[in-house]
């Protein structure tokens, strides 16, 4: 038998079931409904649903068939008009067979008066999210090894030992079957400290343009949450928030493929399941935001790397340590490492939880799809995500709301991450200020050579014999003139970018400053002595003619300098 695609909707008085059976014979079908049971048969399709509310046969039921689309539409009257049926989009839970009220768990605690069913006695029980403290007891090594469980609700053991080759690329912990919970945490914290890169963090801290762009992205749950808040402002019922989240045909197909299960969880395991859900949602929210909803080949790596539940098989004792661990891993592993992204993912997770089970299920289905399309990561679906997708459909909305309030009550600061971020940022800002002050001092001429005084140029010192008498430099023979030129090139290149050196000659535009030097006028700039020395050196180099050359030739050189047209040899 094939399970057909179906969809349930409702109004105040009727429940509508739309069943798609494209290859069935419309003349041969059967429909049965009574109380919470609904059955439909049209060869080769069979559909059995356990409804969240009671329906009744009173003559007002209706049925139609669209031959073009192959869809049966059946309208069933509610036993209590006006009643709101919750969880109509939880298809896996609807496909589950009706439980026997007299059935008992297969495993019971000896001496206990009875094991309460999640949906019955603990319906109104206040869920305690505080840490449950117990006295310390020394535990033997053999006992520790027997407690090395993992997976959804810590129900798995021995899986990694059999799949060591496949899981080595998926998880960070080695030999989880023989690693106690305490040792897992110690190794995880040490690995995070070793992975933290201060340079990468500071680069994202100061150059945060890409991060700011990511923060502006609005995922689908923002609009749904805004609609929910608006509807609550109009005093509408909280149950209507489920209608704000819709599932695609692909997601509905995923739900129909899941195998319905019942989970026997004690109080501790039950709390661990909720805590693990928060951890997975935080990692998922980060990934959706940085990729702006378009998953990439790195999406599976990002989600599992940011979730210690998935890559370290971590278990939790309170909500705050989940948030701290997530913050540490965001600043250690992915491409964008900014504390604002941690806080944004935290607020996104709160919005998803406030939207209820439908929104959480939609996120889990997306995670399941990402892992299923990644070769090594699909094993995490078997260990965690598939069970979460089935379990969340039966979870109590009241407990999910209590978890949301517990998450809203916690706060996170950089100092709590244990990575010395405040000290690191303060040191970086101090260095940045010092570098800025140094650059400002270099750009301000008043800070350069404050004790230097401009020296007037001595044009009379140049003669046809090529000798020079200056107070700022000693006399040198003609054979040392190239070395003098070389010693003047380096500081001049640093001070004036207009200087050009060609071969062994030296050319400079002296359109303005050359005039002042030739006229004996001092320069206001601290570079005046250097320019004067350069002018004298140039004159010494240019006067390389025999003694018979007239002084007028030298004057022509000075005129060329004033026009900025000094030729180069």
Curated annotation (Swiss-Prot):
Origin: domain of life: Eukaryota
Compositional bias per record (Low complexity), positions renumbered to this chain: 452-469
Gene Ontology BP terms: box H/ACA snoRNP assembly; positive regulation of TORC1 signaling; protein-RNA complex assembly; regulation of androgen receptor signaling pathway
Pfam families in the record: SHQ1, SHQ1-like_CS
Annotated segments matching region Disordered: 439-482, 545-569
Domain CS: 1-89
Species of origin: Mus musculus
Protein name: Protein SHQ1 homolog
